[in-house]
Amino acid sequence: MALKIAVSGKGGVGKSTLCGTLALLFASDGFDVLAIDADPDANLASALGLPVEKREQIHTISEEKELIEERTGAKVAQFGQVFSLNPDVAGISERYGISHNGVNLVVLGAVKRAGGGCACPESVLLK
């Protein structure tokens, strides 16, 4: 049985802490857990207890412009495009995920500068 749990809410209310705790609990019960951090201020790695040296190895999806264009059909940081809402996501978690305590973590990444464009194609890959 596959289950997707999405958590959203106001900033500073403990979403990352809750998600990290749930992910670790599910993993400790033997479930395969993929945790996805789509927060521009990504802190789920810390909530999962990843050591600093492992956090520095995280490669974010938003950095992969060619992958995003290939899978969604849209150029990154451009407006007014039509793109696939159901892109092929095969291999993404294996390639970009980092494992710790039974949880595989994938991080979207942050908008680096004001006016950086729409992050819609990147976000579609996370569905």
Language-model regions: role of each:
Residues 3-40:
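Walker A/P-loop phosphate-binding motif and the immediately C-terminal alpha-helix
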Residues 103-105:
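Conserved beta-strand scaffold positions in the cores of enzyme catalytic domains, especially
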